[in-house]
Each structure stands twice: as structure tokens, then as C-alpha cells.
Amino acid sequence: MTFFLSFLILLCQFFIGFGLLVRCKFVEDSPKILTAGLSLILGMGISCFGVFVEELLRIPLTLTSVLAVNVILVLIALFPFASTIEALKNFFSSPLKGVKPYGFVTLCLVLFFMFISGWLSYYSPVLSVDAIAGPDLVAKYAVEQGTMASSVFYDLEGNLSNQPFYAPYITIMQIQFRLAGNPFGQVWIPIMALAFIAVLYSKMRSQTHGAIAGLLTVLFIMIPEMFFYTTSLLTDYSNAVFFGCSVMIVMDYVRTKENKYLILASILMGFACFTRIDTIVLAGLGILSTGLYMISKKEEPFPLPKALISMSGMFLVSFLFFFLWNVLYISAYLPVKPTAEEQLYVTLFDFGKVMKNISEINEKLVFDTIYFAYSIPIFFVWVLVNAAIKRSFQPLLLLLWILSIYVGFVIILGLFPAAVIDWTIKRGFFKFFALFYLFIASTQLSKWLDAKITSWEAR
């Protein structure tokens, strides 16, 4: 029964996301692997937000009510049914292209690593101290008492860390899968990771040869610290998934000027801000950089009013998700709340402190391979070689997002007392790597290699 209920929740989440993609006319011109991965990721976010609305309405969180809200969301997403059912038929019935040998190798390696993640997630208890004292603790009480605003905040008043207050997404996912009967709840994490790998591979494959995209995908999976978090109940991997997908889709918006991409990118960035409180800083900087790029790019720049309206709208959606949990819910629903002094302090204007933080970030994370192996050196070398040989820094928008994230981390260290380089920023670096490898796949150097490999294959 546990397997059936878990599968049912995941199936509902897939259909919720698929329905939204159909409504946005995304499915008809997108690769199946991209549609599948993005459907599940979007559906997970929307499903959690639906349960959150249930909590706001003070409806008890039970297995029946959680399944009901998922089914209702499926019906809303699939309506009108005729067009969505037709899209589903095309999605499942159209023949897939034959898998090339390099594609088969990539697939086997991905499934091997994800099998390890799935096995560990199912059989291992929640091990992270932050999760045990935070989202998983809140989820356990919510399953027993039917609300996230449970007696955990009374029973442990005065002994709570900041962990129970800042992770709504993974808390709600834990509630859903614990209600389904999973003893540790966290089986959804490697499934979300697999969906993200599918999205990233598809995006890279659209830019370069399948062998190159496959190699970059395997390098992405093998990042040591990041792979561990496909089995660990913390906000950071989920946050990187929503954030990375949003950046990939907003690039499609800038390229095509089609509003469907703006809508999807805004929703995904909203979920990223719903996942971690500090993401609003990174979102703001990245959206600002995107707006400046839109009006200043050489080819078909956006009119200033259109760029201003679209990027303001994207930021407002992000802020709304941030506001609903961090301001509305914590203030109006929780019996205990962190004080402003505990959440914020400002050292941004302490130049010595800022330079010390930058130095430590570079020393501990950028120039050390212990956590992320050689992903960062590979990225830097590729950027320099591409610039030297091809005289290009394109896609420049991706570089602007990468720079915005880095600057954002410096700001976060100057705003949040709980933010530390060894944990907060180290895990925040997860947001870099999908963008790193997508940039590599999108460079002129990769396209040149693509042409060489294709020419060799044609012999």
C-alpha cells in the first residue's frame, strides 16, 4: 500500500505539471525528456503549494485531504480534458528516437547513481542534524496532529533552532510521503534529482552533441558533495533544482520573447524562494541582471517598458512566495516565531568583513576540490579556452546569472547571522553547477566539437 500511495502522489504531481505545460503550449515543441522532467518538478512544487493552501485554510492535513488536494489540482491542470488527453496520447505513444551507444552509456551511469540514491533514501533514516531538528521534526508532528503549526513549537519552546522556520517545501513533501506510509519520507529526493538531470541533459543536448552532453551530465552527477545531497533531507538540492530550471527557462524567454517561458520561469523561481528564505536575494540580483541584459543586447533588444514589466513581474511572483511563508504564515499561524534580530544583521558596509568573506569563499570552496571535485576548475578553464580560441563569452546571460549568485552569497553573509561559509554557502554552491555545465555545452567551442564529432560519425 505504501508503494501504491507514493506512486499515486508522484503520478498526480506529474499530471499537475504536465497540465500546466500543456496550458502554456510548452509540450508541443519540447523534447519528451525535457517535458517529463519539468512536468514532475513543476508538479511537485504546485502539489506542495496546494497542501500549503490547505494549511492556510486550517484544513487538517490527513492522507485523505492531501490526496484530495492533489486530485483536485490534477483536474484543474488537465482541464479542458480533450486537449490535455490528446497531448498525453502524443507524449506516450509517439515513438522515441533510437538510443545511440553514447546515450546508452549515459543512461546506464545515470540509473546506476540514482539507484544508489534511491536505495539509501528508502532504507536510511533522516541523518542530517538540520533536518532532524527542523523540517522532518515539523513533518512528524504534522502527520500526528494534522497541522504544521503543531505542539512542537510549544513543547520545545525556547529550545528550537531556526531550522523549523525556513523549509516549507521539504517539510510539506515529507508530510505527503510520511502520510503515504514511508518510514523516513525522503524517497522523493532522488526522484526529483533524476527529473532535474533529465531537464539538464535535454537542455545541454539541444546545444551540443549527445556525447558531449552525456559526458557533462555524468560529471554533474559525480560532484561528490552534491551527489550526497540526493539522499539527504535538506533544502539545498531542491532549491538548486527550482532555481536552475528557472534560469534555463528564462533564457528561453529572452531568446524567443514568448510569454509562456516567462510564466514558467516565474513560477519556478517562486518555488525556489519558497524552498529557501535567502534565495530572494539571488533571485533579485539575477532578475536585475537579466533585465539589464534584455535592454542592452545587440541583437533584438527588448524595449525598456517590456523588459521592466516582465522582470518586475517575475520578481513579484518570487516575492509573493517568499512573503506567504516567511511573513504571513510565520507571523499569523505559528505560536512561536524567530525575532528579526535572530534573522538579520547587517555587515554589508564593513569592507574588511566583506573582503574576508570573499577570501574565505574562494579559499574554501572555489579553489578547493574536496567538495566539488574538478567542476569549478573545468568551468574556468573552459571559459578561458573558449574566449581565447573563439573570442566569445556567450551565452553571456548565463555568466551574468553565475556572477549574480556569487555576489548574492557575499550579500547573504552580510545579512543573515545563521549563514556560514562551511554550510550555507557551500550548499548554496549547488546552484552553480547546472549553469556551469549548461554554459560549457552552449559555447562556440562545444559547437565546434559537435561539428567535428558529427562529421566523424558520417564517415
Name each region found by the language model.
Residues S30-G37, N182-F184, L200-M222, R255-K257:
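Transmembrane-helix signature of polytopic, membrane-embedded enzymes
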Residues S246-Y261:
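Membrane-interface transmembrane helices that cradle and orient dolichyl/undecaprenyl
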Residues L96-P101, R205-A213, T256-N259, K297-I309, ...:
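Membrane-interface helix-loop-helix junctions at transmembrane boundaries of multi-pass membrane enzymes
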Residues I72-S83, F184-T208, C245:
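Transmembrane-helix motifs of polytopic, lipid-linked glycan transferases
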